[in-house]
């Protein structure tokens, strides 16, 4: 009887790790594609069958990994709702883009159906590939960021979640006069992730 909760936790742990890791690569990809940091601040790594660009800047790496580490804990505890990356003008302080990743627990009667299933692993990888490619392709319709920008990451977690002491509350950072585009999604045996980007038409 003890094997059931062990398998459930393994499935949740594996899915939480996969989704948290995806966020790390997705954030890096957005920072590169949107020119938040110069191209020489990134290196190419192979992930999801794709050439991915990740920051080599120690401060950026530390910031992202700290968030991803906390995300993984909240994912495993089933307390995470969404992750948001906001791109802000350094000059005006105006928020210009808002990337939102919604996290939904998959409600399935058989949580063990796809555990260890190679075909399902390939399906998840293909879905992630498609989403990463779509994030890359957003440069074809997103307005060019003419000014220097910075970024912040917001995390929506349940109210009873234990929050790191150096994290602070934030407003939702909803963009005014914005267009919104729904991007692709991917799902594991435990989580479904969908993505959308909002951007200022006339910043």
From Swiss-Prot:
GO CC terms: chromatin; cytoplasm; kinetochore; mitotic checkpoint complex; mitotic spindle microtubule; mitotic spindle pole body; nuclear periphery; nucleoplasm
Keywords: Cell cycle, Cell division, Mitosis, Nucleus
Entry-linked PROSITE patterns: HORMA
Subcellular location per the Swiss-Prot or TrEMBL entry: Nucleus
Subunit architecture: Interacts with mad3 and slp1.
Function: Feedback control that prevents cells with incompletely assembled spindles from leaving mitosis. It interacts with the anaphase promoting complex/cyclosome (APC/C) thereby inhibiting APC/C-dependent proteolysis, a step required for exit from mitosis.
Protein name: Mitotic spindle checkpoint component mad2
The organism of origin for this protein: Schizosaccharomyces pombe (strain 972 / ATCC 24843) (Fission yeast)
Gene this protein is translated from: mad2
